[in-house]
Amino acid sequence: MPQPAIIAKLEQQLRITIAPFDAPDLKAFMRYGRKGDDNSQYFLKDGKLTGLKLRTLGLKDTSFLEERELAGLQGLYLAENDFSSLQLPGHLQQLRLLHLADNKELKTLEFAGSMPLLEEIDLSDSGIQTLQLPACPALQKLDVSRSKLEAFSFASACPALWWLDLSGNGELRKLKMPAGFKALQYLYLYKSGIQELQINGKLPKLVVLDLEGNQLKQWPEKLLLPEGLETLYLEGNPIENIPETIRGSGERHNSVEDVRQYLLSIIDEDKVEYLHQAKMILVGNGEVGKTSIRLKLLDSKATLPKKKDRTQGLDIVPYELKALSPDLTGLEDAIDFQLNIWDFGGQGKYREVQQLFFSPQSLYLFVTACDDTPEDKESYVTFDYWMSLVHALSYDREQERSSPVIHVVNKIDKERMDIDQTAHNRFGNVEEFHAISCKHLTNFEALRKAIPRVLPKVGQGIFRDQYNEDWLGVMEELQRRQGEHHITYQEYRDEVCKDRLNDGEARAWLRILDRIGTVIYFGENEKLKDWIILNPNWVKQAVFEVIDSGERNPVPQWRFEKQIWSHYSEKEREKLFELLQAYDLAYKQQNAFGEQEFVVPALLEHESPNYQDLLPQEELPLKLRFAFKPILPAGTVNKLMVRLKDYIYRGLMWKDNVVFHHPDSNAYVQVEEDWQEHFIYLSVYGKQPSVIYETVTSTLKDINNDFKNAKFLKELEFTVEGFDGEEWMKKRLLKKAGADFFNFLWEKPGIHYKEEDEKNIMDQVKELIAKNRVGDALEMLKSLVPAHLEAEVLQLISRYSKLQRDSRMGILANNDENVERNRIVSSILNLASEAERDNDHTGLSDSSDQEDETFTNVTDQTKKILFICSSPSGKNLLDFGKEFKSIGIARQLADSRDDYAEPIIKTSVEADDLLHIMTKYQPDILHISLHSSKSKGLYFENNAGQAEPISAEDFKDIIETYASDPDGKGRIETIVLSCCDSEAYGRAITNFADHIVVTKDLFPDKAAVVYAKDFYRMLFNNKDIGFAHRSATSAIKRKKYPSDGFAHPIHEIPFLIKNDDK
């Protein structure tokens, strides 16, 4: 077909060559080559110029668009150029697709008028700052993600728009959407700096709303969440009219159900009231006057307590603040506010337990006194430790700050000591400093006034959070039943909530009541989550009765029943035992007579046993220490004793000390805690200590991670130091100094590799994973990967540690645990492969940008399998790791495995990359594992990792374009669509593949894994496709999966489409 005159004219004007491109349609033309080498192309349809692509040419001048011969253009692709501004002439009214991505210098885009046919605009990764969108009634997709938008507006609604992505524009500030967005399904506003969101009208089709990382202060008035909304991200927004506990916290936390129910609950303003309660926690050393302050706040004439009346552990009382002014609260009228005072005793023996009750979004009074001196070494704690503890344990991840603190110095009537009034400046959450005398009430009124003044710093919604009468009615009922001390979650639902709150609302309300100190709810603990403490004093008393019992370890169970907890029922004692064990406060064992007994580390004696004679004495012990920051939680070594109880050597344990021995080594380690100085000390005896050292350090890491997650800490880390005989040196300096006796610090127990073995990283990693030693594989990988991959390995180690913690606590469903583990394993294999490639050895990678990656050891007869998968944010995690692994295992076990190349996996695949990947690898078998929906499409990912569905027609375009490549293989032998409801997508591509496996219903992950394992096992043993399919469905049938909720038995869901028209 002759070249259009306008193309020749543009070639001369721009001094380039513009080649024709034969594509089945315009969308295929616009998609193909996005990451290819062909930058200048045109597309003809019926002999007319329909598409123009001028990509990566450094174009700055847009005057060529004024050519009237371009009036018929429907697709314009100008990505990756250097335009500073662009104005679309009025004659480009036929445009359907406009791609301007990666124009970093582009500041403005202007339209001459309405664009009646425009369906898609891509301005992602551009420098665009201002965009005024004209009337675009046909617009379906608008992507301006990761750009520089500061101002954006719609001239009118876009009734066909189903995808809007403005994420990553940090200065957008405001978004206003007129009524009429009836088709909008995906609205991405992640980290766009939005402070005000105005949505007029309903969004009935909305599926995903991503508002994470903005500065939104008010939820749009009367915007209720549509029934079809599946995902809502609100993390990081200081929204005042939705309580933080309802919004939830944590990166990528989906809060859709809790927020939906809350918005519905407050829709009737006549039934809505404020909560106006919070927790105030008094902390400090013993005998500094915390209880005196509490008594004087309640009654200034109250008698001060005697020493014998000092708080034992914890007292909880309400304190009413009267008539707080509108100037303070921001409300229209004065209000009363209730603070629930938690007064902690300062005795050292309670310190480990007290940490359980510290919480974010509370007001802390840290109390010291003029006579508060370190004479009593056991009970005295320094100012810095107390403040570090409060700063860490009160951290609120949602507000990214710690709870406010008022620093109070009592007893100024006594002999005055030097008080450093500026010390609190080291901690940003200390709001005020007050020196008082409870005895003479000196300056006490100033303290009383400071409490309400600091109160707004507790939380964003402390005065404004509203709840309807059903929620508040549930709270009142729980308070009436406080005399029962505790109830089960089911009793709470059936007898208290009744039909007033659904399950999501009921749990959210418990979290709020726990935060303000009304109840104690162990929602994060699988064993205790069905137990609700109505009277916090009751459970406090039970735990402190153990500590105050004076018993010696081990404590027989009968002594708990007959003496310590004799006034509790058998079921209550059982739950209390679970509480002690769940928080590593005790462990259970059997004595020589088979009787149950408990070891409670908090009851250990101070006196050290004569243990040195029991340990090797050939050489002096090696000295190590772990330096913790910002704190070392008191009782950390006690928790270590509980978790490593099987390694305690001959029962050698005493206050803050224990000796461990591993049966697989000849070494022993004495561990000592100095929580005030933030150190744990290790004395290592004997030979080859790497096993026991690794056991101790990995368990300490687990304890750290558990504590961080349970208390929502921002950080809690430790570094390793060794004593070389003269000074303490950090671990890395020990290695540089050549301290050979510390070589075990770099050994990996059970992992035998040498530096020269780095060429076989993948083999070593696979071997460890096959033995279910994922942690060891990660540690080995950390030692062998190049520097630029270390951060990724450390991230995987953190994820695996969290997975182990969640698994141990029982808070993960089996399926979720398997999914996360397999994702980690898949990432490990990818990193190992990349590390090998960096050592000039061929490996497999999961990076689409690695152009040197290929199938290994293949001939023209070798068949190639390409595994495409994606699990975008906002969707449940797919178990594709296990599915892919099953294919690899089947190949390794097959007699004829050399007929097939080792499969390649590509994760997090974008729809725009699929054709590029297929063209590169030329697979014989294409296996696709994705989320899918009959009505919405196959879910690939976009650049931000979010769900981007494509229709059956778009999927067909991609496969058809691939099959039409004259330089490629053409038809694909087999396509496996391991996706839910994939029949329509398979039917659309029947002309381009010989065999297609599809599904006619939802397809469970576990069934997909079984199918893949058996299907490929048969293929690898030279069975035909039909037989392999029948064998795989039979394997599913033998599993007898329940089919409740499915339209078909599970084994009938996958079926085979054959196409003999070759």
UniProtKB/Swiss-Prot annotation:
Molecular-function annotations in GO: serine-type peptidase activity
EC number: 3.4.21.-
Protein name: Roc-COR-CHAT protease
pH behavior: Active between pH 6.0 and 10.2.
Start-end of each LRR repeat: 70-94, 95-116, 115-141, 142-159, 160-180, 181-203, 204-226, 228-249
Region of interest: Disordered: 836-856
More details: Might be a Bacteriodetes scaffold.
Active site positions: H931, C980
Organism lineage string: Bacteria, environmental samples
InterPro entries (UniProt xref): COR-A (IPR032171), EAD11 (IPR045439), Leu-rich_rpt (IPR001611), Leu-rich_rpt_typical-subtyp (IPR003591), LRR_dom_sf (IPR032675), P-loop_NTPase (IPR027417), WH-like_DNA-bd_sf (IPR036388)
Native organism: Unknown prokaryotic organism
Pfam families per record: COR-A, COR-B, EAD11, Roc
